[in-house]
């Protein structure tokens, strides 16, 4: 299969599944299971629930896809990815 036959969609990671797979809600409303592309594994790009991603799929199987890109957040660099700030966890007396 040539790469020209693959189609791309954007979506939102809703759940992290075992074996490096993700449940992704596409912008079109469909829900699929996707795995991480080799280049993302090689460069150690972590994907968490709630991340916007680009999925590459074969037109022959629209239930599975390959996660090829994680979109950057609108948060400023250095800001925590999730949860409340933990600044006061260890205080001096």
Swiss-Prot record:
One of its GO terms (molecular function) is ribosome binding. It comes from the Bacteria. It is found in: Cytoplasm. GO terms for cellular component: cytosol. Belongs to the IF-1 family. One of the essential components for the initiation of protein synthesis. Stabilizes the binding of IF-2 and IF-3 on the 30S subunit to which N-formylmethionyl-tRNA(fMet) subsequently binds. Helps modulate mRNA selection, yielding the 30S pre-initiation complex (PIC). Upon addition of the 50S ribosomal subunit IF-1, IF-2 and IF-3 are released leaving the mature 70S translation initiation complex. This is Translation initiation factor IF-1. It comes from Nitrobacter hamburgensis (strain DSM 10229 / NCIMB 13809 / X14).
């Amino acid at each position: 299969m040539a790469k020209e036959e693959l189609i791309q969609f954007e979506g939102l990671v809703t759940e992290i599944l075992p074996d490096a797979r993700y449940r992704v809600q596409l912008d079109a409303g469909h829900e699929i299971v996707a795995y991480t592309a080799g280049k993302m594994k090689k460069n150690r790009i972590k994907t968490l629930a709630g991340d916007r991603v680009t999925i590459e799929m074969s037109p022959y199987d629209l239930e599975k896809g390959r996660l090829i890109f994680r979109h950057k957040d609108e948060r400023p660099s250095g800001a925590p990815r999730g949860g409340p700030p933990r600044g006061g966890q260890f205080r001096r007396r």
